[in-house]
Amino acid sequence: MARVCEVTGKGPMVGNKVSHANNRTKRRFLPNLQYRRFWVETENRWIRLRISNAGLRLIDKNGIDVVLADLRARGQA
């Protein structure tokens, strides 16, 4: 399974790990993904999403119905 937020599309980034001696090696920055269940009143059921913290804030701001409509318009849910 990909480490990608289902709402925002955020995924891993590549950067440098920098030591005290300023040696640089490649590393991955992973998004803060969490599994969350949301009650969808219009469908009378639970929806389980793997979302980042930014996606959770987006759902708090706009509501789960708006976010689900956007996901379905993109063909992801």
Curated annotation (Swiss-Prot):
Biological process according to GO: translation
Q: Which UniProt keywords apply?
A: Ribonucleoprotein, Ribosomal protein
Task: Provide GO CC annotations from the record.
Answer: cytosolic large ribosomal subunit
Give the matching Gene3D superfamilies.
Answer: Ribosomal protein L28/L24
Could you confirm whether the keyword Transcription appears in this record?
A: no
Tell me the GO molecular function terms.
structural constituent of ribosome
Disulphide bonds in the chain: none
Which PANTHER family does the annotation name?
39S RIBOSOMAL PROTEIN L28, MITOCHONDRIAL, LARGE RIBOSOMAL SUBUNIT PROTEIN BL28M
Q: Which family does it belong to?
A: Belongs to the bacterial ribosomal protein bL28 family.
Protein name (Swiss-Prot/TrEMBL): Large ribosomal subunit protein bL28
Highest lineage ranks of the organism? Answer: Bacteria, Pseudomonadati, Pseudomonadota, Betaproteobacteria, Burkholderiales
Instruction: Write the gene name.
Output: rpmB
